[in-house]
């Protein structure tokens, strides 16, 4: 079953094994994922479950969204996500939490990376930079040539140049679930995950582990 959950990044810490080995972990708070719609092949052409998490003020909810949430008899959430479903059944109003994962399981975590603003090619693309001396002045961190001459007479698409860095959708694959705290709805995942503390995260079973 490929269903995932939506959570928040609570921060990083470390835990120790019985042998005294320190493991860096990210704490992910899995808020109750409320099912807003269950899609089937007969009605929608594919099987999926749609969920919402968190809360949103009524003044921030459109009439269409309010009707959709009311039909499912759930409170309006801050975001809506959909997960493909290979097996199993869900009903509108059901709750999905951290218990669908187990310690030792591999997961993929998706989030929005931290925004870095406008950055040059050295920070953004790891360019090496030019000489500090030997006749070079005021060109130490410039990218250099960005193309050829009259032929082709343009800069190719995808050329690595200065620009906005970060604030992108990033997925880190095959992270190990070290511990599941069902009482507090927490997942402890080995290693770092994208985004700032408090940011939304989507946790799914690892695609590569599914074969």
UniProtKB/Swiss-Prot annotation:
GO molecular function, one term: rRNA binding
Pfam families from the UniProt entry: Ribosomal_L3
Signal peptide: none
Highest taxon of the lineage: Bacteria
List of residues that carry N5-methylglutamine: 150
UniProtKB keywords: Methylation, Ribonucleoprotein, Ribosomal protein, RNA-binding, rRNA-binding
One of the protein's GO biological processes: translation
Post-translational modification note: Methylated by PrmB.
Function: One of the primary rRNA binding proteins, it binds directly near the 3'-end of the 23S rRNA, where it nucleates assembly of the 50S subunit.
GO CC term, one of those recorded: cytosolic large ribosomal subunit
HAMAP family listed in its UniProt record: Ribosomal_uL3_B
Keyword Ribonucleoprotein on entry: yes
Known partners and oligomeric status: Part of the 50S ribosomal subunit. Forms a cluster with proteins L14 and L19.
UniProt family annotation: Belongs to the universal ribosomal protein uL3 family.
Protein name: Large ribosomal subunit protein uL3
Gene: rplC
